[in-house]
């Protein structure tokens, strides 16, 4: 099962993430948990989230990039749900062998994230990659949709279909 942990603080204003979710919903075996809809008060149901994670083979952290990082509710979710003794540490093997895909949208172009005036995309992914590895997850190459503020509808739809294709290819490779 593919579990998408969706963290968009303003989901009604989303163009790119909305299309990505629409494409993902067309696949069988996909569950989407929208953190800002489930927990508008930031009071996360840890047991429910851990139960959802336990059913997943592929976990996707999908969100818009905010200030070169993740939205605050996703950070809190990571801090609370990936707990010691469950996700890491003594006895913390619940996520071992599962896969993690970081699916992120950005307003800037891909070149905006090259080494130079701004941090490189590989650098920006390191905290998430380190978290994944620490929890025994297999880190997959990220999926990034850039220039979302200026893309036309056709481009956004094409990128969303590419996202669906990434998920489908993972399903086919791991479940025949």
From Swiss-Prot:
* Enzyme Commission identifier(s): 1.6.5.2
Major place of localization?
membrane
Q: How does it sit in the membrane?
A: Peripheral membrane protein
Localisation: Cell inner membrane
Q: Name one GO biological process term.
A: potassium ion transport
- Keywords, alphabetical: Cell inner membrane, Cell membrane, Flavoprotein, FMN, Membrane, NAD, Oxidoreductase
Q: Which cofactor does it need?
A: FMN
Top-level taxon of origin: Bacteria
User: At which positions is FMN bound?
Assistant: 8, 14-17, 65-68, 105-108
Q: Which GO terms describe its molecular function?
A: electron transfer activity; FMN binding; NADH:ubiquinone reductase (non-electrogenic) activity; NADPH dehydrogenase (quinone) activity
**Reaction(s) catalyzed by this protein?**
a quinone + NADH + H(+) = a quinol + NAD(+); a quinone + NADPH + H(+) = a quinol + NADP(+)
Known InterPro entries for this protein?
Flavodoxin_fold (IPR003680), Flavoprotein-like_sf (IPR029039), K_H_efflux_KefF (IPR023948), KefG/KefF (IPR046980)
List the GO terms this entry assigns under cellular component, sorted alphabetically.
Answer: plasma membrane
Q: Which family does it belong to?
A: Belongs to the NAD(P)H dehydrogenase (quinone) family. KefF subfamily.
Q: What does this protein do?
A: Regulatory subunit of a potassium efflux system that confers protection against electrophiles. Required for full activity of KefC. Shows redox enzymatic activity, but this enzymatic activity is not required for activation of KefC.
Q: Which PANTHER family match?
A: GLUTATHIONE-REGULATED POTASSIUM-EFFLUX SYSTEM ANCILLARY PROTEIN KEFF, GLUTATHIONE-REGULATED POTASSIUM-EFFLUX SYSTEM ANCILLARY PROTEIN KEFG
The record describes its quaternary structure and partners as: Homodimer. Interacts with KefC.
| The protein's name in its UniProt record | Glutathione-regulated potassium-efflux system ancillary protein KefF
Native organism: Shigella flexneri
């Amino acid at each position: 099962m593919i579990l998408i942990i969706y963290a968009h603080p303003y989901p009604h204003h989303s163009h790119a993430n909305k299309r990505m979710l629409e494409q993902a919903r067309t696949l069988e075996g996909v569950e989407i948990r929208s953190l800002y809809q489930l927990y508008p008060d930031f009071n996360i149901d840890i047991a429910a989230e851990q139960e959802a994670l336990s059913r997943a083979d592929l976990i996707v952290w999908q969100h818009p990039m905010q200030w070169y990082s993740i939205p605050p509710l996703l950070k809190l979710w990571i801090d609370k749900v990936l707990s010691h003794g469950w996700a890491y540490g003594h006895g913390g093997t619940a996520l071992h062998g599962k896969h993690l895909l970081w699916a992120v949208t950005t307003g800037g172009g891909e070149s905006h994230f090259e080494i130079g005036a701004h941090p490189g995309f590989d650098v920006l992914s390191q905290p998430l990659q380190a978290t994944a590895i620490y929890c025994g997850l297999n880190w997959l190459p990220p999926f990034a949709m850039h220039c979302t503020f200026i893309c036309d509808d056709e481009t956004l739809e094409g990128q969303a279909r590419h996202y669906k294709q990434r998920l489908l290819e993972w399903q086919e490779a791991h479940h025949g």
